[in-house]
Amino acid sequence: MALDAKRMFDNLKVATIASDPDFKITYINKRGEEVFKAVMNAENLLGTDMRGCHKPETNEKLNDLFQEYREKKRNLDYYVMDVPGGKATIVNVPFYDGDEFAGVVEFIFESALG
């Protein structure tokens, strides 16, 4: 039985957020919505600029990271951050349409969020 990719990502218990090369959020699964509501009291993120979900001081790093992905100098990025009740590991992976940078998928692996 084949499961299409959208249904697979929709049902992951890992927050999954995709953005285009201009930082616009193009996909967020249910767990992603729950995490952003719990951590940032943020809702309706689809179509918004993902940099709004990050601290202002990290936006320069995001700009640099996306540029490195465009130039294919990096194939992923990750970091660990404190969240209420524990830690979360955030993993960013670029994706391409042929040779052209098409965006980033971000996975948030939680150690304690419910």
Residues of each region from the PLM?
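Sensory modules in modular signal-transduction proteins
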Residues: M1-K30, K37
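Soluble sensory domains of the PAS superfamily and closely related sensory modules
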Residues: P56-L76
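PAS-family sensory/regulatory domains
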Residues: N41-E57
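Per-ARNT-Sim (PAS) sensory domains and their PAS-associated C-terminal
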Residues: K73, Y78-A88, Y96, A102-G103
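Sensory coupling linkers of modular signal transduction proteins
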Residues: F95-G114
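Sensory helix hotspots in PAS and closely related PAS-like folds
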Residues: E33-E34, R51
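Short, small/polar residue-rich loop motifs at catalytic or cofactor-binding pockets
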Residues: N11-K13, G86-T89
